[in-house]
């Protein structure tokens, strides 16, 4: 008699892809991961697919209102999804998977507007096209249900962070340094998981490097390391209501963009470019450290993920800012917990796809401010 195949512990168990292109807009990170109920996720493959400068320019242009937006948005979405499909094919090849072995692709899309105070958030995407190009089920549009329930739609990663990084008896902070910085506070003994956006990170650091170096980012923080923090400029940058607003809160390029920076710099025209870069790096560190000091003063360890985890100057600035804020916490990357920092966000969206398939909530209302926990996402069948 033929042997019966072992059944999964949960009907949603299986292999999922997660795709994330963040506010840095340099490319898409992808992971292939196996989820089984009651077990730690197992990463089978990872990939990064960069965006051409023409696509980056189109995405940046859509961050602000302009003419002919519907046409430009649709064309950019199609170009974006072709890169997503390349990433999926690379994951499939690296992991040695057939299409039928992949339960679903969880794809975030590219945020071009985030205005929850007006009741909407917009992630550029064409999940129907991605399903057609990959012949795999696609789960997308994770943020809108939380916004519909009165939440900010962000951050969504804290529920995943709590599942993977939480530790009994130890208060930890997971800090994502992407285009925008955000933190997840994982209480060690009771209490709610909390999380929110702190302010700008690589969005401004990268923009300044592009303007003055002609490079997409400040490689290793070397540009910032050549400069000195300008105290008066730092104070002016921190003089922004968002930094003192209570959570739940979220932000993005709608606020923290080159136009915002230029307005702040108008009174500091004599500050050298490298000093501005050092000050932007300090801005990221100080805005995070102040929030940790206020909301997780007993934190003993901060674990960093996102692109900023590859910037040692930024990590040192964060250590210094935490000491100045009176927080005796160590700073390391999530690699110390077994998850490479470049995988964390893509893993989170694979996990959200897994949660959708199981029809389990993906948000934390205590984080986003929604009326309750909700199942997030929409299915686009293969």
Swiss-Prot record:
It catalyses: 1,6-anhydro-N-acetyl-beta-muramate + ATP + H2O = N-acetyl-D-muramate 6-phosphate + ADP + H(+). It comes from the Bacteria. Disulfide bonds: none annotated. Keywords: ATP-binding, Carbohydrate metabolism, Kinase, Nucleotide-binding, Transferase. Its EC number is 2.7.1.170. InterPro entries: Anhydro_N_Ac-Mur_kinase (IPR005338), ATPase_NBD (IPR043129). The keyword Nucleus does not apply. Pathway: Amino-sugar metabolism; 1,6-anhydro-N-acetylmuramate degradation; Cell wall biogenesis; peptidoglycan recycling. One of its GO terms (biological process) is amino sugar metabolic process. One of its GO terms (molecular function) is phosphotransferase activity, alcohol group as acceptor. The keyword Nuclease does not apply. ATP binds at residues 22-29. Pfam families: AnmK (PF03702). PANTHER family: ANHYDRO-N-ACETYLMURAMIC ACID KINASE (PTHR30605:SF0). Belongs to the anhydro-N-acetylmuramic acid kinase family. Catalyzes the specific phosphorylation of 1,6-anhydro-N-acetylmuramic acid (anhMurNAc) with the simultaneous cleavage of the 1,6-anhydro ring, generating MurNAc-6-P. Is required for the utilization of anhMurNAc either imported from the medium or derived from its own cell wall murein, and thus plays a role in cell wall recycling. This is Anhydro-N-acetylmuramic acid kinase. It comes from Burkholderia cenocepacia (strain ATCC BAA-245 / DSM 16553 / LMG 16656 / NCTC 13227 / J2315 / CF5610).
